[in-house]
Amino acid sequence: MSSTLVLETTAYTLEQLIHLDAPQIALAGRSNVGKSSLVNALARRKQLAKTSSTPGKTRSVNYYRVEPEGFYIVDLPGYGYAQCSKEERKKWAKLIEKYIVSCKSLRGLAVLLDCRLDPQRLDVDLTSYARANNIPLLPVLTKGDKCKLRERSDRQKQWAVLLGGRKPLVTASMTGLGIADLWRELRALAAGGLSADDEAEDAPSDTSDAIDDVTA
């Protein structure tokens, strides 16, 4: 099945967040992890989501409707960008927190992880938060084309240890690596086909603390 994305609406404030009955999968990740590029790769369009070499480009919650299936992929603001103001980071944190807490149709959280980097604390915090709160987790390594095959394998193993044996998918927006596999996982997640990982022993369960951690 061939799917694409249509940008339906964008929310910059808490009041602009919308309530949808259709299943939703949130995309989360550090600033400059390649979320916008991945959205474009999924949509097979170059400029659906604006990309930038400057971290922190996505400062809103973007709702993309998946056609023809009808579920939504929701792109959340990137976290960990130290160059923006503290007030701006707090604003993003509240926006992310409100979305996750209030979204009754959230089917899972796709966390994007830079394949070039060892597991980062903010990413570990977010994946632990998802597992502790029984949010089905889909870990995705981005920029796989920037790493050698051995590096990809090593990074998958590192994350598997942290995620109870779950290896993340490897993707590359520029080459299309892993995009078809990612679509299969997203469809299954939207349909409720993936179960949540086992709860992490030391994972934070309080929403505001966890979200503040990853946006601080």
Curated annotation (Swiss-Prot):
GO BP term, pick one: division septum assembly
Domain EngB-type G: 21-192
Residues where GTP binds: 29-36, 56-60, 75-78, 142-145, 170-173
Annotated segments matching region Disordered: 195-216
Molecular function terms from GO: GTP binding; metal ion binding
Residues the entry annotates as binding Mg(2+): 36, 58
Bias type Acidic residues, positions: 196-216
Gene3D superfamilies per record: P-loop containing nucleotide triphosphate hydrolases
Cross-referenced SUPFAM superfamilies: P-loop containing nucleoside triphosphate hydrolases (SSF52540)
Cofactor(s) recorded in Swiss-Prot or TrEMBL: Mg(2+)
PROSITE patterns: G_ENGB
Keywords (A to Z) from UniProt: Cell cycle, Cell division, GTP-binding, Magnesium, Metal-binding, Nucleotide-binding, Septation
PANTHER family attached to this UniProt entry: ENGB-TYPE G DOMAIN-CONTAINING PROTEIN, MSS1/TRME-RELATED GTP-BINDING PROTEIN
Recorded family membership: Belongs to the TRAFAC class TrmE-Era-EngA-EngB-Septin-like GTPase superfamily. EngB GTPase family.
Function: Necessary for normal cell division and for the maintenance of normal septation.
Record's protein name: Probable GTP-binding protein EngB
Species the sequence originates in: Nitratidesulfovibrio vulgaris (strain ATCC 29579 / DSM 644 / CCUG 34227 / NCIMB 8303 / VKM B-1760 / Hildenborough)
